[in-house]
Amino acid sequence: MELTSEQQSVLDGRDGPELADCMKTLVRMGDAFSAPRLVPIVSAHLTGSFKIASFKGYYELLQRIVNAGLKVSVPTTLNPHPGYEYAPQNRVIFRGQKMHEQLLEALGVTPNYSCVCYQYHNIPQFGDILAWAESSAVIYANSVIGARTNRHALLADICQAILGLTPEFGFLLDENRGAQVRVHLDVQTMDAPALGFLLGQKCMDRTPLLDHYPFSQAELKNLGGAMAASGGVTMFHVLGLTPEAPDEETALRGQAPQETLTITQRNLDALRADHGVQKNTAMVAIGCPQMTLE
């Protein structure tokens, strides 16, 4: 990967070992994905918003970075955190949480604690390059907003937030944003979460193009969140609705789809029947993305 003279100086340790380690992480990631260079980002979103013992390496790096006086160089938001003030078990499992949050805030991170950062605090524009690490936010940014981000991992996300840079590969490139699976909808009563769950299973890490449907913002959020959870989908298109799918040829980037699927009402109903809440269920936990008043 080709670095600028400034980036090379950081890598060589001019600004201290902590910043050099951050640059080394991005260079290794870029080399792994054959990225030709590092490019500036508009914002970052972190997943490391909670402290448990298994993420020891991440916390040690975070402490070193704070001790060195480094701060994030772009607007940076955070995923949800545990409700340690309410649950006794959380006060044990996440006993270092308050100190962890103090470190993050010392870095200049916005303490929003939400995976729907794109609704407030961290709202990108079409074409913005991001370094986000929450899968449900990543798919929404790519698909609904038309911003560009890969799905980043813990530790790499904080390095990108500090340097304000990301390796140029994957969904940052035009050639990787085209649809690969054409999805026809034969549905009378739309169930966006069920549809997303099915498509995640069927598409895995491929990008689907759906027939036109007037999804609401909440439905698009839940559609994408379910795809990212049941599969590895990072982007989807809805014909005539999402910004990079004004027509079929544009969404497919002029290529024939690898596969064509038809999702029917029976498919959605069967999924609900198989995965529905049973009568003797004592508790239901709802995860990301968070619900709204709508």
Positions of PLM-derived features:
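Non-transmembrane, aqueous-exposed alpha-helical and coiled segments at domain scale
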Residues: 1-294
